[in-house]
Regions:
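N-terminal small/polar loop signature for handling phosphorylated ligands or for N-terminal nucleophile
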Residues: 46-105, 195-254
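An N-terminal, well-structured beta->alpha segment
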Residues: 1-62, 68-69, 91-92, 148-176
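Proline/glycine-rich low-complexity loops and linkers
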Residues: 67, 76, 130-159, 255-334, ...
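A short, gly/pro- and small-residue-rich
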Residues: 104-132, 254-267, 342-355
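Gly/Ser/Thr-enriched, mixed-charge loops and adjacent short helices
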Residues: 104-229, 233
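Short glycine-rich phosphate-binding loop at a beta-alpha junction
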Residues: 40-50, 74, 178-179, 283-289, ...
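Phosphate-binding and adjacent anionic-ligand microenvironments
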Residues: 281-438, 444-462
Length: 462
């Protein structure tokens, strides 16, 4: 039974992420926590949730499962996902969130020692959830006198203080810098505005009440959903704007003209600063195949190098790079950043704090100026799930044949890079019946058209 996707378990609360599933996953996590021969603290599981209306019931179900699996629960209540991850250092954690999904969805993310479960741990959870409690003792509740206890625990003050302290190592004091923060009625409202004010910013907050109905805008921060923030920044005095999704693991930046800054430009700015600030012999930035070559340009200019890993596998990429002797200073997918110097989790709140101090130091325009910003597009080509493997095998030959002057990498899809810095990536969607085509080029429409035609031909031929 495959439960976990690239970002935990996620789906409708009516059919997918049900209370029954939450109990079973909680019990499996409790068993996982108590099976380790370690300090007693490691048999604790911190449980938190975002502001979704179904979060309270699902958190109670997870707690019942964890405690019946023999581990103790520490209830964090409503918190950002990065705060839950922060609290899970030295123990396990479960976060109830569907991130940027619609309000009728929810999800489960599992952590250990500040890092999301790797695929091996996820498989163990899946096996225990699928097992029959009547025949498999590991799937059944522990003995009545071995159940764990449950207590409230507060983490927000400690998390906010830790983020502010870390961010002060970069950039300059905010000194009244005007910042607009669109929390999207998500739990980022409990952290980012307070931290930025503590750092000296003048903060104006939009959609700052936590509400699981997401009445202000859809939870996913896109140029369209951020129309109010964009107008607010363009018409007001804010130096820039910040937006989060429902659980504050994502961050979007809006410039003073009210335009969203491309996610890869934000990634390149932070990556370059971390490399320049590092005294490591081999500073590494880990990112994904769909990330722009502008990141490579700025990281290389700063004296570092870029390693790419499949989408949803940043932690694996960090481990691989460090095993090879590199010192990972930053890891990111577009809009989702890991700050290894602070913690091993995706953290949009910390990104907001660090970026704010960088902007206060130099201005957003100056930070963007050295970044090559070519036009970027992503399109989807229809492809039945059953054809994807054969289509991708065909494209491993067809793309090089169609673009003989390109450098080809087939480790995570088919990526073609050209001498002028433009590139394209073709990869199958993991959740929908499409093959995705990503491209960045001065004439991006022409490149996307040529690549899409090759993909459509491969789909038709299979």
């Amino acid at each position: 039974m495959a439960l976990f996707g690239t970002a935990g378990i996620r789906g409708s609360v009516r059919t997918d992420v049900t209370p029954e599933l939450a109990v079973a996953v909680g019990r499996a996590v409790g068993r996982d926590a108590t099976s380790e021969t370690a300090a007693a603290r490691e048999s604790e599981v911190v449980v938190g949730r975002d502001g979704r209306t179904t979060g309270g019931g699902l958190a109670a179900a997870v707690e019942a499962g964890v405690r019946s699996g023999g581990a103790s629960v520490r209830r964090l209540g409503v918190v950002p996902t990065p705060a839950l991850a922060f609290a899970s250092r030295g123990r396990h954690g479960v976060m109830l969130t569907a991130s940027h999904n619609p309000p009728g969805d929810n999800g489960i993310k599992c952590f250990v020692d500040g890092v999301e479960y790797d695929r091996d741990r996820e498989r163990v959870i899946e096996e225990r959830v699928a097992a029959d409690p009547e025949t498999d003792p590991d799937a059944a509740p522990v003995a009545w006198d071995a159940w764990g206890d449950g207590h409230e625990e507060s983490v927000l003050d400690a998390y906010r203080a830790a983020v502010a302290d870390y961010a002060q190592g970069y950039g300059a004091p905010l000194g009244g810098c005007p910042v607009a923060v669109d929390c999207g009625n998500g739990v980022g409202a409990l952290a980012t505005p307070t931290i930025l004010r503590d750092l000296g910013a003048s903060v104006e907050t939009l959609e700052g009440n936590v509400d699981g109905h997401f009445p202000g805008r859809e939870s996913k921060p896109t140029p369209d959903s951020l129309a109010t923030l964009r107008r607010f920044v363009a018409d007001g005095d804010a130096a820039f704007g910040i937006a989060h999704d429902g659980d504050a693991d994502r961050i979007v930046i809006v410039d003073s003209g009210g335009e969203t800054v491309h996610e890869d430009t934000v990634l390149a700015i932070v990556a370059e600063r971390y490399v320049r600030a590092s005294d490591a012999a081999d500073p590494v930035v880990v990112t994904t195949p769909n990330a722009s070559a502008r990141i490579d340009e700025r990281v290389t200019a700063a004296g570092g190098r870029v390693e790419r890993v499949r989408l949803g596998a940043l932690h694996e990429g960090i481990a691989s790079a460090e095993a090879a002797g590199g010192d990972v200073v930053f890891a990111a997918e577009p809009w989702k950043h890991i700050h290894p110097g602070f913690g091993g989790w995706i953290d949009g709140v910390t990104s907001a704090a660090v970026l704010s101090r960088l902007v206060a130091e130099a201005g957003l325009d100056a930070l963007r100026d050295p970044v090559t910003e070519r036009p970027y597009r992503k399109v989807s080509v229809d492809c039945p799930d059953g054809k994807k493997e054969a289509v991708m095998a065909r494209l491993e030959d067809a793309i090089p044949e169609s673009f003989p002057d390109a450098d080809i990498d087939t480790e995570y899809g088919v990526r073609a890079e050209f001498a002028d810095g433009s590139w394209t990536l073709v990869r199958p969607s993991g959740t929908e019946p499409y093959v995705r085509v990503y491209a960045e080029a001065d004439d991006v429409d022409e490149l996307v058209g040529e690549v899409s035609a090759v993909v459509e031909s491969a789909v038709a031929d299979i």
